[in-house]
Amino acid sequence: MLQRWLYSTNAKDIAVLYFIFSVFCGMAGTGMSMIIRLELAGPGNQYLGGNHQLFNTLVTGHAILMVFFLVMPALIGGFGNYLLPLMIGASDMSYPRLNNISFWLLPPALVCLVTSTLVESGAGTGWTVYAPLSGIQSHSGPSVDLAIFALHMTSISSLLGAINFIVTTLNMRTNGMSMHKMPLFVWAIFITAFLLLLSLPVLSAGVTLLLMDRNFNTSFYEVAGGGDPVLYQHLFWFFGHPEVYIMIVPAFGVISHIVSTYSKKPVFGEISMVYAMASIGLLGFLVWSHHMYVVGLDCDTRAYFTSATMIIAIPTGIKIFSWLATIYGGSIRLAVPMMYAIAFLFLFTLGGFTGVALANASLDVAFHDTYYVVAHFHYVLSMGAVFSMFAGYYYWSPHILGLNYNEKLAQIQFWLIFVGVNVIFLPMHFLGINGMPRRIPDYPDAFAGWNYVSSIGSFIAMISLILFIYILFDQLYNGLENKINNKSVTFMKAPDFVESNNKFNLNTIKTSSIEFLLNSPPAVHSFNTPAVTN
């Protein structure tokens, strides 16, 4: 056991480790968000006894856990590591031992992050860690330093993973698989890896300078010494904006596969989808200052960032309409992954609308640091990235584990989380339009109504998460029985494809990519000889 899991160089085992880790961190992050919602359920001090520093520490912890320890390990480390080699017909990742250290850098990073909240009074900076609040004057203890170390370790982990994905994709494709024939999920991970490679060094530089300011008496961000805190914002957001695309582009890849399978159609405009993802990735590097409209940028700078940000809506729209065109006229089967995919399309588009509103510098001056922004990025992440993780799990886990989940429970879990997240985040738009500021644990009584509704929603979402954990256990314990039951319910009455070839019909899920042609679960070494794809 120790040999297999601790020293593993097998992409599948490492992917499973990533997945277990991300579920654990996701539960911790959800716990933090529940405490935040409990505190905000009513005006005045509710649960934290007036400890506003603790509130901000929880906000920081929630954000960093969800972004760096849930979404990225699950989508890139979990699904990416498991499926990318299978989809391109590779025996493993290009650098298996590098893959191992990529994972094992994350638990120490988690230890640093948790420690940072426990020493002194925690890092109450928000996940952006803006100077001067994160400076040595305002946060005198080791908390922020520990948070910076956590960011450093997750950065190195992701960077090594990105190098691995790029080399694997370029060098280890099977015979006949040109770049044009790669599945969309492989393209998504490939583009994500480039985003990581180009943006993470900038974050590392920015927080390293902050570390120097805090401990070695430099003044990169100290105005008294000739520095400028706005430099930190530029460095952080030059990473921070590509980061949100790092989280959503793998989700795009997952959704493409699911929409295609459950509509029984190839994705509409497959090459356009690749170009759209690449355009989103490129444009993501040219828009970072739209997070900084209120720091005193020039008028023409603001005009540029407004226009450039709106241009990102074009390739995103291409993707949305291509998915809709894939569904249109298809033979649709509303299995659980497809329900998540359709919910993704609807809610991600809503999040995109609010994003276009926030792109306007003139409007953003009013919306900046209000709950409108919180509502916007939670629609995109909590109902974009997270829904695609659930979709991908329900889509691929029966094949990865060889064990089926309980279909009915999964549908209940979908409806619970669908209702829950909307009840949480829809009212936040109204609060934001009325000017309720972010990251403040107390608020005027006028905001009480919608905040109460939002907190009710968080309980619904929490129940769905608990149900998901039960579904996981049920899948591991009763997976084979579920397989028999599910077949009679869905696959026999409404198979994905019906062919005259019986060998083909026995394969329950039919896709255009090769990972489902393997055994279920796949062998430890899936391809000893290259799979020929044409």
Swiss-Prot record:
Binds 2 heme A groups non-covalently per subunit. Cu cation binds at H241, H290, H291. Its EC number is 7.1.1.9. It catalyses: 4 Fe(II)-[cytochrome c] + O2 + 8 H(+)(in) = 4 Fe(III)-[cytochrome c] + 2 H2O + 4 H(+)(out). SUPFAM superfamilies: Cytochrome c oxidase subunit I-like. There is a cross-link at H241-Y245 (1'-histidyl-3'-tyrosine (His-Tyr)). GO terms for molecular function: cytochrome-c oxidase activity; heme binding; metal ion binding. CDD domains: Cyt_c_Oxidase_I (cd01663). It comes from the Eukaryota. Heme a3 binds at H376. O2 binds at Y245. Component of the cytochrome c oxidase, the last enzyme in the mitochondrial electron transport chain which drives oxidative phosphorylation. The respiratory chain contains 3 multisubunit complexes succinate dehydrogenase (complex II, CII), ubiquinol-cytochrome c oxidoreductase (cytochrome b-c1 complex, complex III, CIII) and cytochrome c oxidase (complex IV, CIV), that cooperate to transfer electrons derived from NADH and succinate to molecular oxygen, creating an electrochemical gradient over the inner membrane that drives transmembrane transport and the ATP synthase. Belongs to the heme-copper respiratory oxidase family. This is Cytochrome c oxidase subunit 1. The gene is COX1.
